[in-house]
């Protein structure tokens, strides 16, 4: 469950929620043009998700310039105006998102 009673059944939101909590805790703003997706395993690995290509296309339509996605998952997309950044672990995502 997400705060406020919103129920989420899609594990692809795991990484985005984790990053949002960390961002709030560290009082650091994220770039508003970054989309984040990925399931987070108990040991911090970012697991593959369903419908990745569809999610990337939709993120581009919504105006995102960059999307963080699970490493090791094929996304056979060309011709889009969005940077696809692959991460294998939570620490990789944090380094990319919170670099100074």
Question: Whereabouts are the PLM-identified features?
Answer:
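Peripheral, non-AAA+ core regions of ATP-driven protein-machinery
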Residues: 1-100
